[in-house]
Amino acid sequence: GSFVNPTTPIR
């Protein structure tokens, strides 16, 4: 979800 952590899902 984040630029530094693209693996996090965007809710």
Curated annotation (Swiss-Prot):
One of its GO terms (cellular component) is side of membrane. Belongs to the multicopper oxidase family. One of its GO terms (molecular function) is metal ion binding. It is a lipid-anchor; GPI-anchor. It comes from the Eukaryota. It comes from Zinnia elegans. Keywords: Cell membrane, Copper, Glycoprotein, GPI-anchor, Lipoprotein, Membrane, Metal-binding. Its cofactor is Cu cation. It is found in: Cell membrane. This is Monocopper oxidase-like protein 1.
